[in-house]
């Protein structure tokens, strides 16, 4: 992949895609293609076929997906599995038909079983049942991994799958129903601070920028307070000093790993520039794969891969470090300066108790993270408030 290569980033406006787009630009890649969902419906096969026929991209980064937190995953199960499967099927298949040189498929570490050993190694995939709340999304992402592997083995394509851990960063989703835990906590605690400081202008500004359930900054004050209370941002019951509380689902004991989105983008570009599918298959099968790739037959070569199974070729992308939800919430509280209470609602689900990636494969390939969670929280909160902070980012961009 060179600086003039024609690169299509599917999902270039989201958290993942926008980070990849920005990082590609910073590294001197100029010939980038991006289409919004209004301009290109990736669920529609005919539209995707027409796009590939017209644009003829050389490289594809598949970051488009329907995503969300525990509530959204559980409430919109059919949409999560259908839309993600259709997006993947269309983009991967037409990338093959139109001779894309390389495709990078982005999944999620929710592909691993609920009770998988920690840290999660790539070979733990499909070894036991998934977490129920996000099972449809996870199954779709597993299908994407298998589709890439299968096309590589049968058609000789160069499609690589990566599984990033929980991401956070610029252009994150702060919708209180559909967002992931870290951006949701930042917004809820920020609004809690605004309430305790009686900073009504800041609350109105926040809701005008990101309305909640149709309620914006121009809505009636009572209506605003009601919708905030619905999402657990409300006066502390029985408080004599006007304190406010922020509700957090679960016990706070589960731990999660978090990676700054622009570092994830850096890892993805590193893989696009340096790592091919043949680099993540067993050494003893590389020659067989190369021969089969040269033939580009629609059936496996006579020697094939029957004696040794090729699976789990995906690459985990993460930090290899985790933090409890309780610790995370308190770090965010300290960063924002909220003086109220954090209320952990134990009647709500925790989800998987621990999700920590084993990143030894990624490290062996030559990439490691640099931004730690404390810096990342500050960076994201400053971004959320409209502030810019480049000092921390320069450390890994220059690297």
Where are these regions (language model features)?
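NAD(P)H-binding glycine-rich loop region in Rossmannoid oxidoreductase-like domains
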Residues: 46-85, 97, 114
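C-terminal substrate-binding subdomain of Rossmann-fold SDR/epimerase-dehydratase oxidoreductases
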Residues: 10-15, 19-27, 191-399
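N-terminal Rossmann/SDR dinucleotide-binding element
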Residues: 1-66, 387, 392-399
């Amino acid at each position: 992949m060179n600086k003039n290569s024609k690169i299509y980033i599917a999902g270039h406006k989201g958290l993942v895609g926008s980070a990849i787009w920005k990082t590609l630009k910073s590294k001197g890649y100029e010939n980038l293609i991006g289409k919004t969902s209004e301009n290109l419906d990736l669920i529609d096969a005919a539209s995707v076929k027409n796009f590939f026929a017209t644009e003829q991209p050389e490289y594809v980064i598949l970051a488009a997906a329907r995503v969300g937190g525990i509530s959204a995953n559980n409430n919109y199960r059919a949409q999560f599995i259908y839309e993600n499967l259709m997006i993947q099927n269309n983009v991967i298949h037409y990338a093959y038909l139109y001779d894309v040189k390389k495709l990078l498929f982005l999944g999620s570490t929710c592909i691993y079983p609920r009770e998988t050993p920690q840290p999660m190694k790539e070979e733990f995939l499909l070894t036991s049942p998934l977490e129920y709340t996000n099972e449809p999304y996870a199954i779709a992402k597993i299908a994407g991994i298998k589709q890439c592997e299968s096309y590589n083995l049968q058609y000789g394509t160069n499609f690589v799958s990566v599984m990033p851990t929980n991401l956070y960063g610029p252009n994150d989703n702060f919708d209180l129903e559909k967002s992931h835990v870290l951006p949701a906590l930042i917004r809820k605690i920020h609004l809690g601070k605004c309430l305790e400081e009686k900073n009504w202008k800041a609350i109105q500004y926040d809701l005008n920028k990101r309305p909640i359930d149709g309620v914006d900054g121009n809505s009636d004050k009572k209506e605003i307070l009601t919708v905030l209370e619905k999402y657990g941002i409300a006066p502390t019951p029985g408080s004599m000093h006007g304190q406010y509380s922020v509700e957090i689902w679960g016990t706070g004991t589960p731990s999660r790993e978090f990676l700054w989105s622009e570092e994830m983008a850096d890892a993805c570009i590193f893989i696009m520039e340096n790592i091919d599918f043949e680099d993540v298959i067993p050494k003893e099968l590389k020659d067989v794969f190369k021969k089969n790739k040269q033939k580009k037959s629609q059936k496996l070569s006579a020697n094939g891969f029957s004696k040794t199974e090729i699976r789990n070729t995906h690459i985990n992308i993460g930090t290899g470090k985790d933090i409890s939800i309780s610790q995370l919430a308190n770090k965010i509280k300290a960063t924002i300066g909220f003086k109220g209470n954090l209320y952990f609602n134990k009647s709500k689900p925790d989800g998987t108790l621990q999700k920590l990636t084993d990143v030894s494969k990624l490290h062996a390939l030559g990439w490691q993270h640099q931004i730690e969670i404390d810096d990342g929280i500050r960076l994201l909160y400053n971004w959320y408030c409209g502030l810019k902070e480049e000092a921390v980012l320069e450390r890994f961009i220059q690297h």
